[in-house]
């Protein structure tokens, strides 16, 4: 956050955040409301939600939804973390893909026919066309997403400029701590679910207020969220579904439904299920997203109605600082998308999916807490934070 402010010299910081389920195909560690508090206490002025229909997607669709929201809010610069750290290299890679489209597509097809995933095939294709020093390593997840952010900016004819901050020490998927002060999100999540680890283990790697809110969530709700918490629901659902039922689920490719139904039979945990399910063709993240759609019963028809090829249909405001509130007041007439401060009365196919995913997310809670949280999510107004006094209002 400090680097973003230094790099962009921004007046305000706006964060677009996924809701209950994430782009890598798993439940968020804690609710979006607690994550909003974390963002506000760490310098963000406006926190808005990226709907499930965009958030649990491949990088291209995820980026398209996020950029459309930021564009509507009048953002002048986007800043993202990447393994590369040079925005120019992203533009070079996009230019090569466009100028060498025929060669690029041929190479991607060639590498996929060799049994590689699309992400791996794309990475190899770029390396065959562009020298490594001018090319973005497309095997890295943050680089993949960063490239799609810039492509979305160009596609939407936005005047937004792109900046990127190089990730140091830990890569996105690193599972262990290699540095005294920097840790990957994956390693932090792993430590939080380690029975032999306490919350103090991760304190050197996250802001003090973030650690406090994390502990507060555990005390109030008795759990953190990961796939294992939902596995019994997931397995039960699959045991009651046929291959024909699964074919209606979004992102279910022909043949994958048979493999899923076969591997679930003898799986005693989500991890063991994924280990049995994965192949060279399907990445772990790609399979997790398919599993998320099974868990939430998100169908191809529902996503079609949500019309994800277009921009996000609304802006769900989750939280704001005093500065953020002032920005919205001054610019609300320029913002073409409806801004939702709650979802109780608004109707849209995208929001129908959102309501369902929230219900599933809270399903692991005990009653009456489960019902209370679900009701609150629809009526919850944006969290307000005074950045001067550092207090929630």
Swiss-Prot record:
Gene Ontology biological process: tRNA modification
Keywords: ATP-binding, Cytoplasm, Ligase, Nucleotide-binding, RNA-binding, tRNA processing, tRNA-binding
GO cellular component assignments: cytoplasm
Pfam families registered for this protein in UniProt: HIGH_NTase1 (PF05636)
Principal location class: cytoplasm
InterPro entries: Rossmann-like_a/b/a_fold (IPR014729), tRNA(Met)_cyd_acetate_ligase (IPR008513)
Catalysed reactions, as listed in the record: cytidine(34) in elongator tRNA(Met) + acetate + ATP = N(4)-acetylcytidine(34) in elongator tRNA(Met) + AMP + diphosphate
EC number(s) stated in the UniProt entry for this protein: 6.3.4.-
Top-rank taxon: Bacteria
Residues the record lists as binding ATP: 81, 142, 167
Keyword Disulfide bond among record annotations: no
Recorded GO MF terms: ATP binding; ligase activity, forming carbon-nitrogen bonds; tRNA binding
Localization of this protein: Cytoplasm
HAMAP family (UniProt xref): TmcAL
Stated role: Catalyzes the formation of N(4)-acetylcytidine (ac(4)C) at the wobble position of elongator tRNA(Met), using acetate and ATP as substrates. First activates an acetate ion to form acetyladenylate (Ac-AMP) and then transfers the acetyl group to tRNA to form ac(4)C34.
Annotated family: Belongs to the TmcAL family.
This protein's name: tRNA(Met) cytidine acetate ligase
Annotated source species: Bacillus mycoides (strain KBAB4)
Gene name linked to the record: tmcAL
């Amino acid at each position: 956050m400090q680097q973003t402010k230094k790099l962009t010299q921004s007046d305000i910081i706006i964060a677009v955040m996924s809701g209950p389920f994430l782009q890598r195909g798993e439940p968020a560690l804690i609710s979006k409301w607690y994550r909003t508090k974390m963002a506000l206490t760490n310098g963000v002025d406006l926190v808005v939600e990226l709907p499930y229909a965009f958030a649990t997607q491949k990088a291209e669709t995820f980026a398209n939804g996020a950029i459309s929201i930021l564009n509507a809010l009048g953002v002048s610069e986007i800043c993202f973390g990447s393994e590369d750290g040079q925005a120019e290299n992203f533009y070079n890679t996009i230019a090569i893909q466009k100028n060498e489209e025929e060669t690029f597509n041929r190479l991607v097809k060639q590498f996929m026919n060799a049994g590689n995933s699309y992400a791996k095939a794309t990475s190899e294709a770029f390396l065959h066309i562009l020298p490594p020093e001018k090319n973005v390593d497309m095997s890295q997840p943050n680089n993949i997403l960063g490239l799609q952010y810039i492509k979305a900016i160009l596609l939407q004819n936005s005047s937004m400029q792109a900046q990127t901050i190089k990730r140091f020490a830990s890569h996105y998927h690193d599972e262990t701590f290699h540095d005294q002060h920097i840790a990957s999100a994956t390693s932090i999540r792993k430590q939080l679910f380690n029975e032999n680890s306490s919350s103090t283990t991760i304190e050197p790697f996250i802001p003090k207020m973030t650690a406090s809110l994390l502990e507060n969530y555990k005390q109030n709700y008795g759990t953190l969220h990961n796939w294992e918490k939902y596995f019994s629901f997931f397995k039960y659902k699959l045991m009651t579904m046929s291959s024909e039922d699964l074919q209606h689920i979004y992102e279910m490719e022909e043949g994958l439904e048979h493999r899923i139904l076969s591997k679930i039979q003898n799986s005693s945990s989500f991890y063991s299920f994924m280990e049995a399910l994965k192949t060279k063709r399907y990445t772990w993240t790609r399979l997790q997203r398919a599993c998320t759609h099974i868990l939430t019963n998100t169908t191809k028809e529902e996503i079609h109605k949500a019309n994800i090829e277009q921009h996000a249909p609304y802006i769900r405001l989750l939280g704001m600082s005093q500065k953020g509130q002032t920005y919205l007041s001054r610019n609300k007439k320029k913002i073409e998308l409806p801004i939702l401060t709650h979802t109780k009365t608004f109707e849209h196919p995208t929001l129908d999916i959102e309501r369902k995913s929230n219900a599933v997310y809270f399903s692991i809670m005990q009653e009456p807490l489960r019902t209370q949280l679900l009701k609150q999510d629809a009526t919850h107004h944006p969290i307000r934070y005074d950045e001067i006094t550092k207090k929630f209002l």
